[in-house]
Each structure stands twice: as structure tokens, then as C-alpha cells.
């Protein structure tokens, strides 16, 4: 009998008569019984020519040895992998005390090996934007006196001291922020690209402080900037989209590092890197949820946990009606509609990676961790469900577009929506009849602009549409969206109109979307909150 050991990067094409051939899943290791050594040695040597293998012959066994991938293991060496994402928003890490509570919360789940995603400390993003706006006009010599800059420095340095970590973990970023504001002041402009770079300091500092604290208390952690670990986006500054190349890149970095050092990853939410510009981009406000679900899909984790300051998804905004209740289960469709129409719990686009990866999302309250929260999955039993939640979207502009040209004609709707496309204005809710179209404009895409720009855009829009129709512009409207089982729309609408009639409210527009989970109604702004409270009482506090 004989044994061969082959060392190299490719498996030679050998024609061996074998009684036993075994392949490991990762190691490309085989054993084979041979009748003699000399003939096989010549065959192997010939087959391995130009492949770069070293061949040696011993007795008893043949092994092809190849470098094995490092096994993933936890700090106790048990070979365990990362299990979930835990994402915490700004209010959950707004102070040293809250960061300590979050750390204790994480440690209270000893069976979890989480990836942590953090937002900036509470109010930091708004303060950074305000500081940037002031820097444009204040002059270079006055940058130091910008109130918001002083607030940010004081908050983060105080937090470092109270956590008992070295201020050196954030000093470079505080100095970088100061220099950036000076640059903005010198240039006298704040571009979208610079705005994204400016707000990135918030997440970069919060994650460094939190990671340092975890290490201080003996829980090994490592900080990551999302834009350095593979979050590749479009170059649409302030509202970038994540590209598919992100998923393998993020997986390679996080899984590879975890397998080597078992340090809990602490990742910046909200941020990415433009694929052309290589500049820092942001995913839009609330984009930390999208960061969390993207990581969950990239790593194929068991669950994505989004920790907020409310007990999961609620039946309505508790600021409008304090008696709002927690919703135990949602589908991704329901969650997406809730987010789009104004619920502040989830980012509108954050559900897509979780849905694609079929990964449950659990929304919980970091102030009340024992509360069950809300679990969002691909499907749920809707047989007894009627209404899930009521969402209010304020300050909406409504357009009534009427023309007899619509009657029996084709192409009219195309002309209308081409006008919106040409002016870069998003449409929210749409309803049509034989001779008219009613629609609302997405305030998130319109009201974020300067007042003068908004007025000009609306004037231009009306002017263009009046070339083909009679246009009526109606402002100060609200959308009340009813999220639930639209298969029971007759029952829902019957109760809705009973409530509105008893409160003397007229519905100006109604739309049922193709999502099959949403009915939207348009009312005057001043009537909206009254309607939400009355609807909540009718659907959630009385017998069906």
C-alpha cells in the first residue's frame, strides 16, 4: 500500500481506482486505497505539471490537503455564529445613562450573539444640520461660537467621562467636525454631499463611545463604520439606495472578523459610500432601520430586533390618542404601508431586505424590554383581523384635475404623470373618475425644500397642468390611512362613515391601494386628529 500527500491550490485530474473516496464540505480532503506507489506517483506527477503542487509519497493513505476556512466560534470556543441584529435609535442612546441601560439590555440576552446598529445620540443629527446652516453665513472666525457645535462637543465629551472611557475615541472626530464647519464657512455653501459627510459624525461618535464602553465592562466589541465595511450605495446624497453588492461585502467583513476575534460588531446606522464618488452617503432619515435589515439579510440571521421608545407598533400615534395599544403581529405589507403613511416606528424601505431574506423583524421598547412588542413576518392569520392601525399624515397638498378630454380617451393620465415626472414631484394617493383625477403630493419630497422653491414648483405644476385640464389646488389637508384586512373593506367603510357622520366630517377623497392592506381618506387638517381619536374608539375600544 502507499500514501500520497498533495499540497496546492487545485485538485489534479487523476484517474484512480478507488475503493473509498471522501470529500469534506470545506476541506477538499480525500482518502484512497492504492495497489502500489510507483505507477500512481508517475501519474500524479504528470497530472500536476504546471499546477504548482508538491507531491510526496508515504505509506498507508492519500490525503489532499487544502487550506480550510476558519471556523466561526464564540468567545468560549463553541463554534457559535452571530444570531441577530439589535438596532437602537437615537433616544435609546441619548445619554451615558441610556447607553449603560442598552448595554445591560444586550447582556441580559446571554444566548444572543448580536450585531449592534446604532443611530446618533438623540438630537445630534438635527444639531449637526443646524450647525452646518449657520456655518454658511457666520464667517470662519465665528465657527467656534456656533451654539450647536458647543452642544455636540459638550454632549459627547460628557458622555465619554460618564461612561468612564477615554475621550481619545472621539477627539479626532470632534476636531474633524470643527474643521469641516470652517470649510463650509469659507465656501459659504452646504452641498448635499457635504451635508451627508456632516451628519455622519453623529453615528461615528455614538458607535465609538458605545463600543469603548462594552470593552470597558469586559464585553469584547469592535466598532465599524458602515461605509468602510461594504455598504455600497447610489450617489443620491441625502437619500441614497443600497446596491446589491453590499450584501456579500458586508457578510465577508463581519463574519470573517467575528470568526477571528468574537468581538460584538457595533455598526453605524444610516450611512453608506457612493459607488462612483466613494463619498459618504446617507440613506434618508430613519435609514438606520434599513442598515439593520440589510445586515440581517446579508448574514442570514435568525431575527432583526428594532429597539425604539414605544412598545412596538401601535394602533395609532400615542401623541394623538394616549390609549393607543400595541399590535402583536404585522405582515411586511402592513408594516411598509404604516411606515410610508407616517408611522414613526419603521423606515418605509427597511422592510424590503427582511422580506427578501424572509427574516422576522421584532420591534421592541428599550425603555420597557419585557413588553412583547410587535413581530413582523411575511404572512399571518388574517381571518379575524379587521383593522390593524390608523396612521395620520398631515400637511398634505391635494390636487383636483378635471377635463372632459378624459372621457373615452387614452393617454390623458400619461400626460398628467409626465408633468409630475418632469418637475420631479412625487405623488402620494390617487383616485380617478371618468372626467377627473384627485391626488395628493408627497410632503416628504416637497416640504423638505426651501419655501420659495416649494411655491415656485407648485406654481409651475399648476401652470403646466392647466394646459390640459382645470386644476384646483387644495392645501392643509391630511391623509388618514386605515391599515388592515381590506378584504373586509365594506365593514371598515361602513363604520368609518358612521363615525365621520356623527362628527360632522366630510371625506374629500378616498383611495384603496393595490397593496390590499390600506384604505386612505383625505380630510381637512383641523379635523384630522378628532377623526383619528373617534376611529380608534370605534374600532379598538368597542365590540365588533
Swiss-Prot record:
- Tell me the Gene Ontology biological-process terms attached to this UniProt entry: lysine biosynthetic process via diaminopimelate; threonine biosynthetic process
Q: Can you name a GO cellular component term?
A: chloroplast stroma
Q: Which Gene3D superfamilies match?
A: 3.30.70.260, Acetylglutamate kinase-like, Aspartokinase, catalytic domain
Pfam family membership, one = ACT_9
> Catalyses which reaction?
L-aspartate + ATP = 4-phospho-L-aspartate + ADP
Q: Which residues form the ACT domain?
A: 401-479, 481-544
Q: Tell me, what controls this protein's activity?
A: Allosterically inhibited by lysine, but not by S-adenosyl-L-methionine (SAM). K(0.5) for lysine in the presence of physiological concentrations of substrates is 12.5 uM. No inhibition by threonine or leucine and no activation or inhibition by alanine, cysteine, isoleucine, serine, valine, methionine, glutamine, asparagine, glutamic acid or arginine.
- To which pathway does this protein belong? Amino-acid biosynthesis; L-lysine biosynthesis via DAP pathway; (S)-tetrahydrodipicolinate from L-aspartate: step 1/4; Amino-acid biosynthesis; L-methionine biosynthesis via de novo pathway; L-homoserine from L-aspartate: step 1/3; Amino-acid biosynthesis; L-threonine biosynthesis; L-threonine from L-aspartate: step 1/5
State where it is primarily located.
plastid
Residue interval of the organelle targeting sequence: 1-84
User: What does this gene product do?
Assistant: Involved in the first step of essential amino acids lysine, threonine, methionine and isoleucine synthesis via the aspartate-family pathway.
What name does the UniProt record give this protein? Aspartokinase 2, chloroplastic
Q: Which organism is it from?
A: Arabidopsis thaliana (Mouse-ear cress)
The gene for this chain is AK2
Amino acid at each position: 500500500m502507499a500514501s500520497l500527500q498533495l499540497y496546492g491550490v487545485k485538485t489534479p485530474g487523476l484517474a484512480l481506482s478507488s475503493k473509498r473516496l471522501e470529500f469534506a464540505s470545506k476541506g477538499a480532503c480525500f482518502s484512497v486505497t492504492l495497489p502500489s506507489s510507483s505507477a500512481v506517483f508517475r501519474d500524479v506527477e504528470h497530472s500536476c505539471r504546471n499546477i504548482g503542487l508538491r507531491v510526496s509519497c508515504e505509506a498507508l493513505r492519500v490525503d489532499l490537503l487544502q487550506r480550510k476556512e476558519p471556523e466561526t466560534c464564540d468567545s468560549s470556543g463553541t463554534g457559535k455564529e452571530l444570531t441577530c441584529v439589535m438596532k437602537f435609535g437615537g433616544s435609546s442612546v441619548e445619554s451615558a445613562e441610556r447607553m449603560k441601560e442598552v448595554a445591560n439590555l444586550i447582556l441580559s440576552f446571554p444566548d444572543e450573539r448580536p450585531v449592534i446598529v446604532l443611530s446618533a445620540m438623540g438630537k445630534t443629527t438635527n444639531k449637526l444640520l443646524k450647525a452646518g446652516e449657520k456655518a454658511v453665513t457666520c464667517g470662519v472666525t465665528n465657527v467656534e461660537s456656533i451654539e450647536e457645535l458647543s452642544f455636540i462637543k459638550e454632549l459627547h465629551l460628557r458622555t465619554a467621562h460618564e461612561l468612564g472611557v477615554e475621550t481619545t475615541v472621539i477627539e479626532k472626530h470632534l476636531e474633524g467636525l470643527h474643521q469641516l464647519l470652517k470649510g463650509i464657512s469659507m465656501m459659504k455653501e452646504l452641498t448635499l454631499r457635504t451635508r451627508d459627510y456632516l451628519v455622519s459624525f453623529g453615528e461615528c461618535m455614538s458607535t465609538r463611545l458605545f463600543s469603548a464602553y462594552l470593552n470597558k465592562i469586559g464585553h469584547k466589541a469592535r466598532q465599524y463604520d458602515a461605509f468602510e465595511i461594504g455598504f455600497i450605495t447610489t450617489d443620491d446624497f441625502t437619500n441614497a439606495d443600497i446596491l446589491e453588492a453590499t450584501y456579500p461585502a458586508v457578510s465577508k467583513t463581519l463574519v470573517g472578523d467575528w470568526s477571528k476575534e468574537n468581538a460584538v460588531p457595533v455598526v453605524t446606522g444610516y450611512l453608506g459610500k457612493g459607488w462612483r464618488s466613494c463619498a459618504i452617503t446617507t440613506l434618508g432619515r430613519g435609514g438606520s432601520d434599513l442598515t439593520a435589515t440589510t445586515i440581517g439579510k446579508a448574514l442570514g440571521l435568525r431575527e432583526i430586533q428594532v429597539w425604539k421608545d414605544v412598545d412596538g407598533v401601535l394602533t395609532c400615534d400615542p401623541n394623538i390618542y394616549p390609549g393607543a395599544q400595541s399590535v402583536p403581529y404585522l405582515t411586511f405589507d402592513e408594516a411598509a404601508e404604516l411606515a410610508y403613511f407616517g408611522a414613526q416606528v419603521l423606515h418605509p424601505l427597511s422592510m424590503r431586505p427582511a422580506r427578501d431574506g424572509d427574516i422576522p423583524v421584532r420591534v421592541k421598547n428599550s425603555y420597557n424590554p419585557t413588553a412583547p412588542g410587535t413581530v413582523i413576518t411575511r404572512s399571518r392569520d388574517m381571518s379575524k383581523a379587521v383593522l390593524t392601525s390608523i396612521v395620520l399624515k398631515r400637511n398634505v397638498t391635494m390636487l383636483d384635475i378635471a377635463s372632459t378630454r378624459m372621457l373615452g380617451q387614452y393617454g390623458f393620465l400619461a400626460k398628467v404623470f409626465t408633468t409630475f415626472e418632469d418637475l420631479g414631484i412625487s405623488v402620494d394617493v390617487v383616485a380617478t373618475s371618468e372626467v377627473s383625477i384627485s391626488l395628493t403630493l408627497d410632503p416628504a419630497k416637497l416640504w423638505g425644500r426651501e419655501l420659495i422653491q416649494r411655491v415656485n414648483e407648485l406654481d409651475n405644476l399648476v401652470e403646466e397642468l392647466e394646459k390640459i385640464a382645470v386644476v384646483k389646488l387644495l392645501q392643509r389637508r391630511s391623509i388618514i390611512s386605515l391599515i388592515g384586512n381590506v378584504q373586509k373593506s365594506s365593514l371598515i367603510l361602513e363604520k368609518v362613515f358612521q363615525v365621520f357622520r356623527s362628527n360632522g366630517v366630510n371625506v374629500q377623497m378616498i383611495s384603496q391601494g393595490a397593496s390590499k392592506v390600506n384604505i386612505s381618506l383625505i380630510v381637512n387638517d383641523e379635523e384630522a386628529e378628532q377623526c383619528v381619536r373617534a376611529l380608534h374608539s370605534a374600532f379598538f375600544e368597542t365590540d365588533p
